[in-house]
Amino acid sequence: DRIVVMKNGIIQQNDPPQNLYDYPCNLFVAGFIGSPQMNFMDVVIEKKDDGYWARTGGGSIALSSEMDKAALAPYVGKTVVLGIRPEDIDAVPNGEAHDLEGRIEIAELMGAEINLHVDFQGVRLVVRAASTYAGREGDTAALVLDRSKIHLFDKETELAIAH
């Protein structure tokens, strides 16, 4: 089985459903597949001795060593779009090591899970957490990103750089 994703009558990607979800070819497909949709934020790519990093306004996130280094190299010092799905962000207890933190604006109970809408420096991130997560609206949420699930997109062309 394959799904064709089109935008304005133009085929964006023709792939099995899991490939569309795991390896979207551009920002449109990444945002189209999945509910809630993928989170996006601007970051700057940095090269350090221990690998590549994505710098946000509040710090840096180490990128997976599995990412294509040749694809990342031309983007050092440039702004790209980082994408990550809500289920690939963990809300951890405050005080634990984390990548980002932000204020919980909405805690949307969905039954066995809760969708946290977190304001991170003016960017709204949706985080899918267990319904037992103790944080509520107004609290600070400490977030850990699954580095193996980070997607990077060219800010100008919107094409995928690396997954």
Predicted regions and their residues:
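Internal alpha/beta loop-helix hairpins
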Residues: 1-60
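Non-catalytic connector elements of ABC transporters
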Residues: 36-41, 47-163
